[in-house]
Regions:
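Conserved acidic donor-binding segment of nucleotide-sugar-dependent glycosyltransferases
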Residues: 346-347, 351-358, 366-371
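Aromatic "clamp/platform" in nucleotide-sugar-dependent glycosyltransferases that forms part
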Residues: 295, 314
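A conserved mid-protein helix/loop that constitutes part of the nucleotide-sugar donor-binding site
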Residues: 17-22, 232-255, 261, 272-278
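C-terminal alpha-helical cap of glycosyltransferases
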Residues: 383, 387-420
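Donor nucleotide-sugar binding/catalytic pocket of nucleotide-sugar-dependent glycosyltransferases
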Residues: 152-158, 162, 176-218
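A short, well-ordered alpha-helix in the C-terminal region of glycosyltransferases
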Residues: 257, 282, 359, 366, ...
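Short hydrophobic beta-strand element within catalytic cores of glycosyltransferases
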Residues: 331-334
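Short acidic/histidine- and often glycine-rich active-site loop of Leloir-type glycosyltransferases
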Residues: 324, 336-347, 351-352
Length: 420
């Protein structure tokens, strides 16, 4: 039985974490002994981890990192992690150099600075593994590179490398040492290889895995909008972070309201910008028009019930929220940026817009006043996702009803095949 370790930063309800859960389900417990290490000991999705996966954390807090209680716990964890194994002292020069670089660029990413320390102060794993897989950038990647004993080491990238704030100096050029590097989209791959061209021969695209039928099933469960609103509904799903550019969406909603459009915009997600966004909403008098609903355990009824799904972000890797919207046949409008361009074919299965309040509002009006076009985009998007799923299963050699499918999938993964 082969021993495999997966490492992820946290196990919260974001897209990469959900994709990891789906990937874990593809491994046979009869063939693999699977360990999971959550670097920061926290995240609400722990209860969805397959029962045959062994959580190696000595302590674990099953609370969202975005909730009030979760933020408090996360802060304590980070504080206590500064001191073990001399992590802070050992990385002091590293911190100063990278902080200086960030200050020159006027883009300070505190989380990126701290990942090295979080990695160096993590658990000491004495077990030898056949495969160790870092499923996220930053801490998980550093931990697998520096602190795991394994015959083969793989890592995943889920974001546009440079836009997200990573650099060779920040990573200490660790990527060439990995046996295989998987990116979730072609654009993520291209962005990464601009920084690490020497890794071209070992970098493959491995699309996020989604359980399409489970998403459709959950979309039919009770839930969704409960405000009785009779106008058009716009939905966005994602964490409240700078990457998602919600301030631009709020400004677009203001333009729509000023023009008399009968539309309401709903956001599912939590994050550090909640208070700031709430203030902006109040300043523009949009309390009844742009609603921050928080995180939802089952967001899929909202997708099914909305008139338009909008994902106007600064950059993406490959958005699982957009994939889910397409699976459910939503009309999708996304900003013209890395990641989004790869997911939506403008004028075929969705629409692209500039990350500008005026352009967003104009594209929204065009779509909401053209039911025939919306239906076309929704049909084409759902059809495309069905075909993509089939293509991925073919490459992964998984066909329903065959007992050997998991073995084939794992054998392919061992030989570095990718899912497309």
């Amino acid at each position: 039985m082969r021993k495999v370790l997966f490492v992820i930063n946290t196990l919260g309800g974001a897209g990469a974490e959900r994709a990891l859960l789906e990937l874990l389900k593809r491994f046979s417990p009869q063939q693999y002994e699977i360990d999971l290490y959550v670097l920061l000991d926290q995240g609400e999705l722990i209860h969805e981890v397959p029962e045959y996966v062994n959580l190696v954390n000595k302590e674990y807090f099953a609370e969202s990192v975005l909730s009030a209680e979760g933020k408090k716990k996360l802060g304590k964890t980070v504080w206590h992690r500064l001191w073990p194994h001399m992590a802070l002292g050992k990385n002091f020069i590293y911190l100063l150099r990278n902080l200086g670089t960030m200050m020159k660029k006027k883009q300070i990413h505190v989380d990126k600075l701290l990942w090295r320390i979080m990695s160096d102060s993590g658990m000491v794993l004495k077990k030898h593994y056949d495969m160790a897989i870092a499923y996220l950038e930053g801490g998980a990647t550093y931990f697998v590179h520096d602190h795991v004993d394994a015959d083969q080491k793989f890592t995943f990238l889920h974001v546009d490398y440079s836009y997200a704030g990573y650099t060779r100096a920040l990573d200490q050029a660790c990527y060439p040492d990995f046996d295989r590097i998987f990116t979730v989209s072609d654009e993520v791959k291209e962005s990464f290889l601009q920084v690490y061209p020497e890794c071209a021969g070992k970098t493959e695209v491995f699309h996020n895995l989604l359980d399409r039928e489970e998403i459709k099933r959950k979309a039919e469960l009770p839930g969704g909008f409960s405000d009785g609103y009779e106008g058009k509904r716009i939905l966005t799903v994602g964490r409240l972070t700078a990457q998602k550019a919600y301030e631009t969406a709020i400004d677009a909603m203001k333009l729509l309201k000023d023009e008399g459009e009968q539309v309401r915009w709903y956001v599912l997600g939590e994050g550090e910008l909640h208070r700031k966004l709430r203030q902006r909403i109040e300043e523009l008098g949009l309390q009844e028009d742009f609603l921050l609903l928080g995180a939802e355990e089952n967001p899929y009824p909202y997708y099914r019930q909305c008139d338009l799904y909008v994902h106007a972000t600064r950059f993406e890797g490959k958005s699982i929220a957009v994939q889910e919207a397409q699976i459910l046949g939503c009309t999708v409008l996304v900003s013209d940026c890395s990641g989004n361009r790869e997911q939506v074919r403008d004028g075929i299965d969705g629409a692209l817009c500039q990350l500008d309040a005026g352009d967003i509002s104009e594209k929204i009006k065009e779509l909401l006043h053209n039911q025939e076009l919306c239906e076309k985009y929704g049909r084409n998007a759902a059809k495309k996702m069905d075909q993509e799923e089939e293509k991925g299963l073919e490459l992964f050699e998984i066909n329903e009803g065959k007992s050997e499918t998991y073995e084939k999938a794992e054998r392919n993964f061992d030989h570095y095949s990718c899912v497309q």
